[in-house]
Amino acid sequence: HNREVAPAGPGELAPLSLGPLEVCPPVVLAPMAGVTNYPFRAICRGFGAGLYVSEMITARPLVERRDKTLKLADFGPDESPRSLQLYGVDPHYVGEAVARLVGEGKVDHIDMNFGCPVRKVTRKGGGAAIPVKPNLLRNIVRAAVKNAGAVPVTIKFRLGIDDGLLTYLDAGRIGEEEGVAAVGLHARTAAQLYDGESRWDAI
């Protein structure tokens, strides 16, 4: 692309408040593994959205400082606010990862992934499978919020596993009770993957 688009002015769209972070315009590039890397975020930034979330970063290898994960978690010098999506199935590692990211001043916003429908993630009990276990979901969210301090934490989740196991209302309530700054609903089930229509009435 060869043009810059000016962000919307304050009078055009009301900003989105995520704790102390003000997103203006209130347009968010959703995180997606293998897609929302730095070059892609840089291209999208030219079109004027307010928040660009990184691709999914796994908590444990981040805590263990594995090179590949550290590179994925890097931001460009021109990126502000720095928004990272974190994935984990163990509250301990999630808490440690958040504490490290915040303590090292690496992020301005953390989004927790509870919506990934990919089988290699869900068969390990992660992503969209976590809200099926509300106590685990609560403990992971609590660990993230506790260690984030003033950095806003949001959560992203789906309607549920399939039409017979819908978990989104409970997931949203747990997020609210544990102090997240916002919740994001992908209004499809994990079984739908990225096919079919979103159920806007659920949103």
Predicted regions and their residues:
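Flavin-dependent oxidoreductase catalytic cores
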Residues: 1-203
